[in-house]
Amino acid sequence: MLKQRILTALIALSVLAIVLFFVPPVVARAAVVVLILAGAWEWGGFLAGESNGARIAYTLFIGALVGALLVAQDNPLVVENVFRLALVWWLSALVWMLFFPTPIPRALTWVCGALVLVPAWAALDFLYRQTPDLLIFVLLIVWVADIGAFFVGKGFGRVKLAPQISPGKTWEGVLGGLTAVVLLAAAGSRYFDIDVAVLVPFCVAVAMLSV
């Protein structure tokens, strides 16, 4: 499983690097939109099972939201408000997980998908427009945290993190993932010339959301 995770991460990173650095920006940004729409298709499956009509409708719904945001993204307040909304959503989701499993109405599930997918696209597109290096670095935080948590958790995991939500995860794995991310942040601070005291807390926060 560990080898598979590392191999998947390396393949994904290689494909991503090709898309980000060797194709025109408009194509790279379009590829990110396609990725988000693929996520919308999968999310539609959670809502409607095997109903392709509902999945198509949900994919079009997310596509329309992304399109509207594309039109308005030159207004910095719009993008900032999307990120604020995403922050509120993820904090609310963390609270909701304390009461897991708790059923939610199907209509709210549609909204939850939009709150996951649309801000994700906005963040990926924003990072790419700053510099592709920064986008890859943020994705590396997630991948390194995942691989580090899996490796340490498999070898030393004893105390379960959240048995009802993800029985296989342990606190030892979390600490292993965060340690790996701190090392990545130290390297990133030199590459991007950012104070390590600033970058480490940022990377740890991102990793905490991912594990």
Explain the meaning of each model-derived region.
Residues 2-206:
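Membrane-embedded alpha-helical bundles of polytopic integral membrane proteins
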Residues 210-211:
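Functionally important transmembrane alpha-helices
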